[in-house]
Structure formats: C-alpha cells, structure tokens
Amino acid sequence: CLVGSEMCIRDRRTLKFGFYTVILIEGHAEDFLYGRKYYDYSNASLIFLTPGESFKADKNKILSQKGWLLAFHPDLLYHTSLEANIKNYSFFYYKPEEALHLSLREKTKIIECLCNIGEELQHAIDCHTKTIISRYIELFLDYCTRYYERQFITRNEPNKLIINKTDLLWDEYVQSGKLMNGILPSAEYCARNLQLSPHYFSDLLKFETGKNIYEYFQQKRFETSKRMLSDKNNTTALVADKLGFSNVQYFSSLFKKITGVAPNEYRISQN
C-alpha cells in the first residue's frame, strides 16, 4: 500500500498502475477537468483506477496542481472484509471524465482518511497491520461512496436528461425490432450510446429510479405493451411478438397477473 502526498501532476504521458489507484487532484474554480461542470464543487477531484488501467492527464490543460495518490495491491485484500466488498465500489470502473468532485469539507475528510492510512504505514508491521490498513481503506471508500451519492443529487437535473435519453433509446430499440429476439437493452448498449461508462450509467439509473437496468426495462416493456394495446390495429399476438415475449400465451398470462385483466380485455376497454 502506498500513500503519496503533495503529488505534482505535470506529465502528459499515459500512466499505468498495477494497483487499485485513487488520484486526488486539487482544483480551482476555473478548471473544468475530468467531467466537472459549473454546478459541481471545485476544491478537488478524485479519479479511481483498477489494476492495469491507464490514465492520461487532461490534454486540454497542463496540470500543475498538487494532490495525493493512494495505491494498494489486490493481494492486500486477501482474507479481509474489503476483499468481499471491493466489488461494491463500482466507481473504480468509471471513466476519468466521471470523476468525483469534492467540496472543501469533503476534501478535508478525504485527506484525513489518507493521513490515517499513511500514519499506519509508518507503524512497525505486526499482526494487526493488514487489518487496520484495509479497514482504513474501506472507510475511505465508504466516504467516496457517500460523496458520489451527493454528486448524483447535485446533478439531479442533468441526470433527468440522461434518463429521458434512455427512454428515447428504448423507443428506438423497440421500433427497430431489436427487442423481437427477447433481449433487453444492456448497460453496455445504453452507456455506449450515451457516452458513459456502463457502471456509471447503472449507478445513475439505480439512484434516479430505484431500479437496476433489468427492472427498469421490464417496466418500460410493460408500459409499452399497454400503449400498443391501446391501438386497435395491434393484436395481442403482434404486441407479444414485437416486445420479444416467447409466445402469446406467456405474454397474456404475465399481463393478466400484473393488471388483473387479459390483454384482449384491456385492448377492448381502451377502444
């Protein structure tokens, strides 16, 4: 495990770390780097990298800001609670442009966590060292999770636009016939079209709607079926086929289970 303070980022070369890596870059109000928008905080930015992932400083600006670096090898996680929990910190799979932007208070708390890790690294190694360091790292990452959730709140309006664009993607997916094979849009498909990382998109969707991507599109599928049945030109069989249900009997059974009426009855009631 390594904690570096007063790190100075001046190199534009691509850097590659063989560790889990967190880079804290101290920022200024006029800097709009790593996805920061005018509505984000500007005191510092946190970028997260998985082992083997590359990082390149923003090409639009020579970075001379000072910062911190936390790096820890995957082996450090063995037989610790962090080994099981590391997968929950999905921001390690975000793009650098999806960085976490900190307020002054948040930055102070993050640096305090880093100092605690650094202090423990200076302690003589004993049977407690690995446990204490891993718990400090886990606490640090829990704070990062809290602050990312705060950032989702700060970005509420832009995030609503992303959800609206997701709904448009769904409509296009259905209209193009892609759903007829029964495969719902994936996080990768949506993220690619929205120019986001799959993990960031999935976390944003969950935060805004309370649903994972499968649950969200299943709901959209049902809403679309009701809308299509409202058109008297659409038969139950056509709707089932267009929305990728394996057969009309399964669709009818599921529709009645959810609404209490059969598709044909619903269709008649709407027309």
Write out the residue ranges for each language-model feature.
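Single conserved hydrophobic/aromatic residue that forms the stacking wall/gate
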Residues: 1-4, 8-9
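Terminal helix-turn-helix DNA-binding modules in bacterial transcription factors
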Residues: 207-249, 268-271
